[in-house]
Amino acid sequence: MEGISITKLLVIAVLIVLLFGTNKLRTLGSDLGAALKGFKKAMNDETPAAKKSDGVEAAPRVENKE
């Protein structure tokens, strides 16, 4: 059992290009890139908001000592 060789990957890539065409794949790639960029931006924008305090401090944690 070899797994997937480079020739098998190339054949799969050629079949995908033949089925969908280069224009459709280019559009799909740019849409995927824009989605990832938006996701990363949203994650970076959320981090400072989570760190910002509202002036309310959390109560210290109390452990049960028996």
UniProtKB/Swiss-Prot annotation:
It is found in: Cell inner membrane. The chain crosses the membrane at residues 1-21. Its main location: membrane. InterPro entries: TatA/B/E, TatA/E, TatE. Residues 46-66 are annotated as: Disordered. One of its GO terms (biological process) is protein transport by the Tat complex. Keywords: Cell inner membrane, Cell membrane, Membrane, Protein transport, Translocation, Transmembrane, Transmembrane helix, Transport. It comes from the Bacteria. It is a single-pass membrane protein. One of its GO terms (cellular component) is TAT protein transport complex. One of its GO terms (molecular function) is protein transmembrane transporter activity. Belongs to the TatA/E family. TatE subfamily. Part of the twin-arginine translocation (Tat) system that transports large folded proteins containing a characteristic twin-arginine motif in their signal peptide across membranes. TatE shares overlapping functions with TatA. This is Probable Sec-independent protein translocase protein TatE.
